[in-house]
């Protein structure tokens, strides 16, 4: 993708298309995944796109993560170490930025920045022995290979647990297909006449409000909106951005046109994606079985 500021603008296209942690999981979704069938999830754009059907929901990811921690606890017990898995966090809908800003409240509070409350939670403090065996060398290459005469898994008990749960439910080919569709449909959608017209209408609306931008991606490239504290100017710009999207119907037009592209792309890879979906269901079922055993 051609971007002026790749790290920032990647939030648009890569929301919902890159793997969380590892593509070996067979999941094309990113950090902003669908939560459940909640009204919040239904109201988003990313999670209503056709390709979202081939991703885990946040609730499913939470089950998988909880199961991995349960397996890690069993592994830790073999080293006579007590590990208490973190309590599961109820999935919360996160900002949907595939098409840039779309939430008036977030724009008014944080401008073009992410809501600080959506930052990853810090892991609980663990004592040195527990931490060394739980994470192994993936966190600290100097960690000893053994603990009290027993070999520590190279990536620790948690890494081993993740590997054990993942190995039977990996579909990298399907995950690659889903990720490719999500990326390509986004890029191609911006070239469609309907979306281009939407950009022009949005740009004209922004011009009336005193802001000169050709596309909704442009404000994210502004240095002043990426560094330092959020200013009133940034909040005002972000508010106008969202307001103009609503007035011109850009969000719905963009979503509709990209959905058409994805539907056609999915039809060409139907078998691959069906297998990916089956693998997802099997892995979630396995995770829930682990949790049921306690």
Per-segment meaning from a language model:
Residues 1-21:
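Secretory targeting and sorting signals
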Residues 17-294:
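Cell-envelope/extracellular polymer assembly enzymes that use nucleotide-activated donors
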């Amino acid at each position: 993708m051609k971007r002026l500021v790749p790290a920032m603008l990647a939030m648009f296209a890569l929301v919902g298309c890159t793997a969380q942690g590892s593509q070996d999981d067979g999941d094309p979704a990113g950090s902003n995944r669908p939560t459940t069938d909640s009204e919040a999830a239904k109201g988003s754009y990313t999670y209503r796109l056709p390709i979202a059907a081939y991703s885990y929901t946040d609730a499913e990811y939470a089950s998988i993560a909880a199961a991995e921690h349960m397996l890690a606890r069993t592994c830790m017990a073999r080293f006579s170490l007590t590990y208490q898995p973190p309590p599961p966090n109820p999935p919360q809908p996160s900002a949907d930025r595939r098409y840039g800003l779309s939430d008036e409240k977030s724009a008014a509070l944080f401008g073009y920045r992410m809501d600080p409350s959506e930052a990853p939670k810090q892991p609980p403090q663990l004592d040195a022995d527990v931490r060394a065996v739980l994470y192994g060398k993936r966190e600290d290459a100097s960690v000893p290979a053994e603990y009290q005469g027993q070999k520590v898994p190279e990536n620790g008990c948690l890494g081993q647990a993740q590997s054990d749960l993942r190995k039977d439910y990996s579909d990298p080919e399907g995950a690659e297909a889903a990720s490719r569709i999500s990326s390509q449909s986004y890029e191609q959608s911006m070239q469609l006449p309907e979306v281009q017209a939407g950009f022009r209408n949005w740009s004209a609306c922004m011009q009336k409000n005193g802001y000169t931008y050709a596309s909704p991606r442009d404000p994210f490239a502004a240095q002043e909106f990426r560094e330092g504290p959020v200013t009133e100017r940034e909040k005002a710009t972000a508010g106008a951005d969202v307001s103009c999207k609503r007035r011109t119907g850009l969000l719905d037009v963009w979503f509709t046109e990209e959905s058409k592209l994805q539907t056609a792309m999915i039809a060409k890879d139907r078998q691959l994606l069906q297998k990916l979906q089956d693998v997802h269901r099997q892995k979630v079922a396995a995770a829930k079985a682990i949790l049921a055993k306690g």
